[in-house]
């Protein structure tokens, strides 16, 4: 926005935030903000107001803004006198001058370490509610020339992004890694595939301070032809990428030997010649290959099994001694309903079968503003508005799987009516868990038998909905959530249509 000031007058702009939802003002709750400015003006006034500007809830003023040649970050604080979930932020220039403003932020004052790191505290709580044990920061945002580590430290500005022409460096790799470290969760992040080596080395050195597993992905969906920067699915592109990987990994590993590295060539079975050349180019440098899989409902685990089998076959043919393994950094489904929850549960069943050969599986996307999507990926695990955050069905499926995790895979056989099943147990052999997906539109009666005796049902938890397209709206955020059905299942061991069931058994 540009603000022009006739002599002695005031002019300004007002904004109600994303989708004009409003800024959630709470009486007495201090809010911290900033805006980037360029130009000169006698003063800037910041105010929280009613949506129409007729009532003012809080004001603050910064005198003498003098930034004629470069953008300057101006910080301010506001303490509203009333509660209003639909307030607006006004920025006015006072006196004489001319000033440009951009990239404004206003958030509640932090109450814990996550807030101090620049995170919305309720969003982090939503991550924790899922029981996440791995985080990944990446996507096509890295496939632009200005997505570079050198711009992610110190004073930040903005850049021309993949999804939005004006994109912010405000929350990037440093903030993400600090958040993961505070959560005590291993994490992966993508860097530009053609990051300058000297900057990559600085990043590797900075990462030495963190005592958690860190995985550096070189690029994202490379050699896929999705945009000009990521390269085409041809041999010149894959060799150019391989050369950059070897250069970056060699330098970063020398600086920080603890780092693990991930190949980002897009796995497309129709381009096996490209995949094989990509393997030759990066084998011995990358520890993992990132696999992106589609998930469209129950049965999606088949996609994982097929891709893992193809990768294993390629490795056996080209270098049986290779230590490269797989990681699923994106489960993509373009929907966030009950169907997506069944897809994730199905994929996790297939992932357990792979053991240590598969590092993790991350359902995309972690976050999505309610009723707002810029890039077509309508698949948020956690939805949010300015004043709340809540889990969609897939995130609840993740929470169920995490809460019932056991380390040891147990052989399982399904007879009769088709359901998807995986069985696990603890190291002591006293607790066993069955993960069961029923993708059929009919209920299924289950008869569970163990190879050894003494097992009794300890708990049954079920996730189901009235329809595969059901999701959780903001006015009913727990419409679809796990329900304890232990007593019901003991009496009638039946599984609802199109549902995910976790059965926990115990023995002395």
Tell me what each language-model feature is.
Residues 88, 111, 115-132, 176-183, ...:
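An active-site-proximal structural segment forming one wall of the substrate-binding cleft
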Residues 418-454, 460-465, 498-504:
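Carbohydrate-binding surface patches
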Residues 454-495:
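Acidic, Ser/Thr/Pro-rich beta/coil linker or hinge segments at domain junctions
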Residues 1-171, 186, 201, 228, ...:
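Extracellular and organelle-lumenal recognition/adhesion modules and their flexible linkers in secreted
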Residues 87-98, 235-348, 354-357, 417-418, ...:
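Noncatalytic carbohydrate-binding groove/subsite architecture in carbohydrate-active enzymes
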Residues 107-117, 156-169, 186-195, 221-242, ...:
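The substrate-binding groove and active-site-proximal loops of carbohydrate-active enzymes
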Residues 327-430:
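Aromatic/acidic polysaccharide-binding cleft in carbohydrate-active enzymes
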Residues 72-76, 491, 501:
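Short strand-edge motifs at loop-to-beta-strand transitions and within beta-strands
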């Amino acid at each position: 926005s540009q603000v022009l000031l006739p002599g002695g007058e005031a002019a300004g702009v007002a904004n109600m935030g994303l989708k004009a939802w409003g800024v959630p003002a709470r009486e007495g709750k201090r809010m911290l903000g900033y805006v980037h400015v360029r130009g000169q003006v006698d003063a800037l006034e910041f105010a929280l107001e009613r949506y129409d500007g007729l009532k003012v809830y809080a004001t603050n003023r910064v005198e003498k803004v003098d930034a004629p040649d470069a953008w300057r970050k101006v910080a301010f604080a506001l303490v509203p006198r009333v509660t209003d979930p639909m307030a607006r932020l006004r920025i006015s220039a006072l006196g004489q001058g001319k000033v440009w403003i951009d990239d404004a932020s206003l958030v509640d004052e932090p109450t814990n370490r996550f807030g101090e790191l620049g995170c919305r505290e309720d969003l982090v709580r939503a991550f924790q509610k899922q029981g996440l044990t791995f985080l990944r920061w990446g996507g096509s945002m890295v496939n632009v020339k200005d997505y570079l580590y050198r711009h992610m430290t110190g004073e930040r500005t903005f850049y021309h992004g993949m999804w939005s022409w004006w994109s912010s460096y405000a929350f990037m790799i440093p903030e993400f890694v600090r958040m993961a470290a505070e959560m005590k969760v291993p994490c992966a992040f993508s860097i530009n595939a053609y990051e300058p080596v000297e900057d990559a080395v600085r990043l590797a050195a900075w990462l030495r301070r963190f005592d958690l597993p860190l995985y550096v992905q070189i690029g994202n969906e490379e050699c896929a032809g999705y945009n000009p920067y990521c390269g085409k699915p041809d041999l010149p592109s894959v060799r150019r990428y391989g050369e950059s990987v070897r250069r970056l990994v060699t330098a970063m590993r020398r600086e920080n030997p603890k780092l693990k590295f991930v190949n980002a060539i897009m796995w497309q079975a129709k381009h096996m010649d490209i995949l094989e050349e990509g393997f030759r180019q990066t084998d011995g440098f990358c520890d993992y290959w990132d696999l992106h899989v589609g998930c469209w409902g129950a049965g999606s685990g088949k996609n994982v099994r097929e891709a893992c089998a193809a990768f294993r076959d390629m490795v056996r043919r080209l270098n049986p001694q290779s230590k490269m393994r797989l990681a699923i950094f994106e489960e993509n489904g373009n929907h966030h309903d009950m169907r997506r929850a069944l897809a994730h549960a199905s994929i996790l069943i297939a992932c357990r079968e792979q053991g240590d050969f598969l590092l993790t599986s991350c359902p995309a996307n972690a976050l999505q503003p309610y009723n707002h999507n810029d890039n077509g990926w309508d698949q948020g695990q956690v939805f949010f508005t300015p004043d709340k955050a809540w889990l969609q069905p897939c995130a609840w499926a993740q929470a169920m799987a995490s809460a019932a995790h056991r380390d040891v895979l147990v052989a399982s056989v399904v007879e009769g009516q088709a359901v998807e099943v995986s069985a696990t147990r603890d190291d002591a052999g006293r607790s066993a868990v069955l993960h069961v997906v029923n993708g059929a539109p009919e209920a299924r009666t289950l008869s569970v038998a163990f190879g050894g005796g003494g097992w009794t049902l300890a708990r049954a938890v079920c996730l189901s909905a009235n329809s595969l397209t059901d999701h959780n709206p903001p006015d009913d955020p727990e419409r679809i959530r796990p329900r304890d059905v232990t007593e019901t299942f003991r009496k009638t061991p039946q599984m609802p249509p199109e549902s995910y069931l976790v059965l926990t058994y115990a023995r002395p």
